[in-house]
């Protein structure tokens, strides 16, 4: 009888199904603006892949590759400018024509959203070195946010940090 009860218990345990419910972990807080108090949560790495494709094309100075993951026109907040630039493919081609090469080395990617947001954001910290055709070199430490909707980047916001000389 003990064997039958033991077998029934084992069979019951084996037949149990564990349901894993994935709940987004919310953390942090928006401190300013209309979404003050909203929490952040992580999103899919598919968004990271979109940004990686963009930056690979950026490093290769390949506008056609860039526009595989960019909308036809994007809003680009360049770190050195006070106002955003509305950039299309022709603008990017013209912009890149001043450079011999570009090297952007990324330190990390964080895909996220805040509560109620419909687009996804990938935050990126990187070092970017651009070599101009006139021989000058632009060297920046960047923090950027890439805004994605329907699998395409529609806005890029960039901030630059001063190099520590200590």
Task: Label the model's feature ranges.
Residues 1-4, 17:
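Positively charged n-region of N-terminal signal peptides that target proteins for export
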Residues 118-128:
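A short hydrophobic beta-strand element
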Residues 51-54, 65-67, 74, 88-92, ...:
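Hydrophobic pocket/interface hotspot
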Residues 101, 129-139:
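Short, cysteine-centered beta-strand-loop-beta hairpins and adjacent loop/turn segments enriched
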Residues 19-22, 139-166:
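Short beta-strand edge/turn micro-motifs at domain boundaries
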Residues 4-13:
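Sec-dependent N-terminal signal peptides
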Residues 67-113:
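A solvent-exposed, acidic/Ser-Thr-rich amphipathic alpha-helical stretch
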Residues 16-60, 68:
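Short, low-complexity N-terminal intrinsically disordered segments enriched in polar/charged residues
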């Amino acid at each position: 009888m003990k064997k039958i009860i033991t077998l029934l218990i084992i069979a019951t345990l084996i037949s149990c199904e564990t349901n894993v419910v994935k709940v987004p972990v919310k953390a942090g807080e928006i401190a300013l603006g209309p979404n003050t108090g909203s929490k952040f949560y992580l999103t899919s790495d598919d968004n990271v892949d979109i940004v990686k494709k963009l930056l690979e094309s950026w490093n290769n100075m390949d506008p056609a590759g860039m526009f595989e993951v960019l909308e036809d026109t994007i809003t680009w907040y360049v770190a050195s400018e006070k106002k955003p630039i509305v950039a299309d493919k022709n603008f990017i081609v013209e912009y890149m024509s001043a450079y011999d090469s570009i090297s952007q080395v990324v330190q990390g990617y964080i895909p996220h959203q805040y509560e109620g947001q419909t687009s996804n954001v990938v935050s990126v910290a990187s070092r970017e070195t651009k070599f101009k055709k006139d021989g000058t070199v632009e060297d920046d430490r960047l923090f950027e946010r890439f805004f994605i909707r329907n699998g395409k980047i529609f806005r890029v916001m960039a901030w630059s940090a001063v190099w520590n000389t200590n």
